[in-house]
């Protein structure tokens, strides 16, 4: 790793309010990986996304606040590159020998990211010597920076990604009953296969977050303007049907405030 450029894909999709980070959990979790790379004298090029700008530049979704937060936590100088990623090349990244970390702008400012565009992935790969994925929560997506890129650069799992996989292995292969799973998020459609796989293994599954709104709506409750995903009734019906067959109780909120 000595003096190698490491393209580090992280999930720094943290909540922002008026340009301020309101929860740094995702940032805190990736510090061990960054410190490990620094200890081994690597140069780090951080890739991430935040929000859903849908291929357009949205100033409120810039990674600049995340850069400032990392500076404070690591006590290191970090270079933020706001330049169009498609115009950045490897010699633009580090101005001098002492620079160790750079952060590129929000990947989702570019429609090629979510389209899993091959040329965009090739370009990202050209910026470094090695690719490290430490974004477990993004790894189910076939995007240019998580999937296609691995075809063009030596690729490895990061420390946090390995911890997440180990945790999953424990709950799927070393189960001690009775056991309950809590699952949340906003999109139930992206988690349907996970839920179906978990139902036979768990006694109870508690659905929280935005997903719970879809369940409440399915059950006939008025959810007002609360966040929900469209066209999910069939998915939820499948979940409840399978849960009955496998003797798994699906639990969802009963006492809620509707937006």
PLM region descriptions:
Residues 1-259:
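Active-site loop-to-helix "anion-binding N-cap" substructures in soluble metabolic enzymes
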């Amino acid at each position: 790793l000595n003096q190698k450029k490491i393209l580090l894909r992280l999930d720094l999709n943290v909540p922002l309010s008026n340009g301020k980070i309101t929860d740094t959990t995702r940032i805190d979790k990736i510090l061990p990986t960054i410190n490990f790379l620094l200890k081994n004298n690597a140069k780090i090029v951080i890739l991430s996304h935040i929000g859903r700008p849908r291929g357009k530049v949205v100033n409120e979704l810039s990674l600049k606040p995340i850069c400032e937060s990392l500076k404070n936590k690591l006590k290191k100088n970090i270079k933020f590159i706001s330049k169009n990623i498609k115009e950045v090349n490897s010699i633009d990244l580090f101005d001098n020998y002492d620079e160790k970390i750079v952060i590129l702008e929000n990947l989702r400012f570019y429609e090629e990211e979510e389209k899993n565009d091959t040329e965009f992935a090739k370009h990202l790969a050209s910026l470094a010597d090695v690719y490290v994925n430490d974004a477990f929560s993004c790894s189910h997506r076939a995007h240019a920076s998580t999937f296609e890129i691995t075809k063009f650069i030596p690729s490895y799992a990061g420390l946090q990604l390995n911890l997440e996989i180990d945790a999953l292995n424990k709950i799927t292969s070393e189960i001690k009953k009775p056991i309950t799973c809590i699952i949340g998020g906003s999109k139930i459609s992206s988690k349907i296969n996970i839920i179906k796989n978990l139902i036979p293994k768990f006694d109870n599954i508690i659905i929280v977050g935005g997903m719970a709104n879809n369940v409440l709506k399915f059950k006939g409750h008025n959810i007002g303007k609360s966040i929900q995903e469209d066209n999910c009734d069939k998915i939820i019906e499948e979940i409840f049907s399978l849960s009955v067959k496998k003797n798994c109780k699906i639990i969802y909120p009963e006492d809620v405030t509707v937006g």
